[in-house]
Curated annotation (Swiss-Prot):
One of its GO terms (biological process) is proteolysis. PANTHER family: METALLOPROTEASE TLDD, PROTEASOME SUBUNIT BETA. The gene is Psmb5. The keyword Protease applies. Induction: Down-regulated by theophylline (THP) and up-regulated by 1,3-dinitrobenzene (DNB), two reprotoxic agents thought to induce infertility. Its EC number is 3.4.25.1. This is Proteasome subunit beta type-5. Residues 1-59 form a propeptide. Disulfide bonds: none annotated.
Length: 263
């Protein structure tokens, strides 16, 4: 009954023709000690619940932006469950292939599953077409997959970042099937603080070290103001020859660095 209460669909009991038994549950022998009505164990048909019964607790800060030397991707590493810190070492940048990265914001299971599935589909595309999938095609593929489950409780807000024949690419995709191309995005509970830093310091003409520092500072500022973000700042750089992991800096060390520079 726990599953039925979540899905809010009645369990099929002794329906005519169910499992081809013509409503005769006595023909289904589950052995000694089994419930009298074995058909009550069957899962209900798929349906959309009227209202979610499981509260999704999440918080994070991720960002990505394009500049003249590629795409910068950064994220914190804290995982929370309501007021509790579940982990300080979560990897929120998912490596799809050597030229594509995805970020994780929302439900960790949803993001991890769908982006791993995307990685599989991208590999199949490469084997069939003998060429690397474009960033636009990869993001569209993900948007199409999750759109089929719109309204069913998925929680995912991701950025697909990469480099293809057209140059650096950056797309935002969420669990509602939305897909947006842009030059800079930040997703998560701390994104408002990260955007404040990015809006002030972002320029397409940034040098590499300037871009690194901007991303670190934006994530640090979000962790300083948002209780659901923290841990370490994981920084990646997507270049023409593929992505590299630049650094992983503890936010406590960044706090000492940035506060000591204030007069």
């Amino acid at each position: 009954m726990a599953l039925a209460s979540v899905l809010q669909r009645p369990m099929p009991v002794n329906q005519h023709g169910f499992f081809g038994l013509g409503g005769r549950a006595d023909l289904l022998d589950l052995g000694p000690g089994s419930p009298g009505d074995g058909l009550s164990l069957a899962a209900p048909s798929w349906g959309v619940p009227e209202e979610p019964r499981i509260e999704m607790l999440h918080g994070t800060t991720t960002l990505a932006f394009k500049f003249q030397h590629g795409v910068i991707v950064a994220a914190d590493s804290r995982a929370t469950a309501g007021p509790y810190i579940a982990s300080q070492t979560v990897k929120k940048v998912i490596e799809i292939n050597p030229y594509l990265l995805g970020t994780m914001a929302g439900g960790a299971a949803d993001c991890s599953f769908w982006e791993r599935l995307l990685a599989r589909q991208c590999r199949i595309y490469e084997l069939r077409n003998k060429e690397r999938i474009s960033v636009a095609a990869a993001s569209k593929l993900l948007a199409n997959m999750v759109y089929q489950y719109k309204g069913m409780g998925l929680s995912m807000g991701t950025m697909i970042c990469g480099w293809d024949k057209r140059g650096p690419g950056l797309y935002y995709v969420d669990s509602e099937g939305n897909r947006i191309s842009g030059t800079a995005f930040s997703v998560g509970s701390g994104s408002v603080y990260a955007f404040g830093v990015m809006d002030r310091g972002y320029s397409y003409d940034l040098q590499v070290e300037e871009a690194y520092d901007l991303a670190r500072r934006a994530i640090y500022q979000a962790t300083y103001r948002d209780a659901y973000s923290g841990g370490a700042v994981n920084l990646y750089h997507v270049r023409e020859d593929g992505w590299i992991r630049v650094s992983s800096d503890n936010v406590a060390d960044l706090h000492d660095k940035y506060t000591s520079s204030i007069p």
